[in-house]
Structure formats: C-alpha cells, structure tokens
C-alpha cells in the first residue's frame, strides 16, 4: 500500500445525517465502504456487491486494491488504528447479525427505517416487499445508483419532523421485519419513543423490530468515536441503559428477544477485531 492510501484514510471524518445532503451522503458512504471492503475478504461475513456503487471515486480505488488480501488487511488495520472503538467492525458485525435475524423471521414484508445505502432489498434473494424510509437527500442519491424494482417502495421522510404513522398511512398491516440500523443515537428521545409506538400500530402482532442503539453511559464518554461525531456537529443525542431496555420496550408494546453489543456480535462470528461494547443491536417482537 502506497503513501496515498495513508493520506486518504487519515483525512476521514465520520459524519452522520443532519438534514444536509452532504452529511447525509457521507454517512451512508462510509458504511457502504466498510461493507464493500468486507465483501472483498476471503472470509467475508456477507457479500454486498452493491456497496461499491454508492462510493465516490476516492473510495472505489481502495476497494479495488482490497481485492489483494494483504492490502485489504492493511486498509482495515489503518481504519481501526485511526478510529479506535471499532466503527468498522461494529458496522460489519451488525450487518451480518441483522441479515441472520431477518432470514430467521421469514416476514411477509420488510420495513427499512433510515435505510441509507442498505442493499438488502437488492442483494437478498427472495426478499419480500420492502419499504425503505429515509431522508429525501440520501434516498435520492441511492436511487441514482440502483434500479427501481417492483418489490421496493421508497418513502421519503425525516423522523425528527414527521411521524412514521403519518408517512406510512397506507402501509399494509402484515407480519413485518423492521430494520432500524444506525439511526436511533442521532434522533431525539421523543422521535425514538414516537417511532416505536407507531411501529406497534402499523405492523401486525408477531412482527420483529431490529434496532441499534448506544449504551447511554457512552453519551458522556470521551471516546474517540464520540468525539469525532461531536466535532463535526453531530453528537449522539439518544441512548439506553441495556438493563432498562426490556422495560422500555414493554411500555411500548414490544417484548425483547435479544440484545448484543457489537463486540459480542463480532465474537459470535469469530472475528477478533475491534468492535464496540457500547454499540448494541437489539431485537423485539410486537405483541
């Protein structure tokens, strides 16, 4: 790997959606980059051949270089060193875990909240009708890069400004798997509460809600990951104490079925690479 690789990686800044097209697309790009790099590994946890489509030229050449295994490993090490806390492996582990949970549930339909550049509706064979809810800027950028398909319905919405129930007024009330990945920690407490309550009314009993969240204790921690998002004006605004999650969900009509940290998920898939204890993946069933 040449010096240019180090220069490019050192300049990364992790930014999350704030309603601005630039920040919306950069967040999705970084997750897509992690997925594209993972896809090039011989021991990959999943194959996302769509991820590269969402990347700008400055990242695509990294992905091409990563096809050569030693280079791919080197890129991963640089990312993990530059951004302690494990954002790369946390994203990879959660992607595989959610893929598995989705397959196990065998839903009648799928709802992707804050879909970003999630390609599950395209890459998972036989996936049922899928509704993608996201900020209009990110959704528009995504649709420029993939073909519309009959089983995919796009719903542009900002959950900090509009209720999910209003946005999905015509949503069929069927047994659904809801995937809410990488979003809650950037929303307000009121938005998370309202969305969970809406989900129990618009989906059928027995539906599965899969969501990620950060341990509330991490909201005040001086971690490099947290400092990075705060530095660019996107601090984490919502978290839950894991011990409180069962009760929190029960009050909103959901029964918790599982809750793993990203680190635990990485261990489940035999990956001894940095992943976060405070970044968590939970899944619950609608009563």
What are these regions (language model features)?
Residues 268-287:
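Core SAM-dependent methyltransferase catalytic element
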Residues 11-111, 117-157, 170:
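Rossmann-like AdoMet
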Residues 163-172:
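Short amphipathic alpha-helix with an adjacent loop that forms part of the alpha/beta core around
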Residues 164, 186-198:
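A short, conserved alpha-helix within the catalytic core of class I
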Residues 220-235:
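Short, glycine-/aromatic-enriched active-site segment of Class I SAM-dependent methyltransferases
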Residues 237-259:
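Short alpha-helix
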Residues 203-216:
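Conserved beta-strand signature within the Rossmann-like core of class I S-adenosyl-L-methionine
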Residues 175-191:
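A short SAM/SAH-binding and catalytic strip from SAM-dependent methyltransferases
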């Amino acid at each position: 790997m040449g010096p240019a690789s180090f220069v490019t990686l050192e300049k990364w800044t992790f930014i999350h959606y704030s309603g601005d097209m630039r920040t919306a697309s950069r967040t999705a790009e970084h997750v897509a980059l992690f997925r594209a790099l993972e896809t090039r590994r011989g021991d990959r946890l999943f194959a996302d051949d769509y991820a590269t489509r969402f990347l700008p030229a400055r990242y695509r050449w990294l992905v091409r270089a990563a096809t050569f295994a030693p280079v791919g490993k080197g890129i991963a090490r640089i990312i993990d060193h530059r951004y302690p806390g494990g954002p790369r492996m946390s994203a990879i582990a959660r992607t595989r875990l959610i893929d598995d949970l989705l397959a196990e549930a065998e839903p009648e339909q799928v709802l992707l909240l804050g879909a970003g550049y999630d390609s599950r509706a395209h890459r998972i064979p036989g996936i049922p009708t899928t509704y993608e809810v996201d900020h209009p800027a990110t959704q528009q950028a995504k649709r420029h890069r993939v073909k519309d398909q009959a089983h995919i319905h796009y719903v542009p919405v900002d959950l900090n400004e509009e209720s999910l129930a209003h946005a999905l007024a015509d949503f069929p009330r069927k047994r659904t798997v809801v995937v809410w990945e990488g979003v809650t920690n950037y929303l307000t407490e009121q938005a998370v509460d309202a969305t969970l309550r809406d989900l129990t009314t618009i989906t059928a009993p027995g539906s599965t809600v899969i969501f990620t969240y950060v341990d509330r204790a991490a909201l005040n921690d001086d971690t490099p990951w947290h400092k990075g998002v705060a530095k660019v004006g996107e601090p984490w605004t919502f978290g839950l104490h894991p011990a409180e999650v069962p009760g929190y969900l029960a009050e909103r009509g959901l029964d918790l079925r599982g809750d793993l940290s990203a680190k635990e998920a990485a261990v489940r898939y035999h990956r001894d690479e940095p992943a976060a204890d405070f970044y968590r993946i939970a899944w619950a069933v609608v009563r």
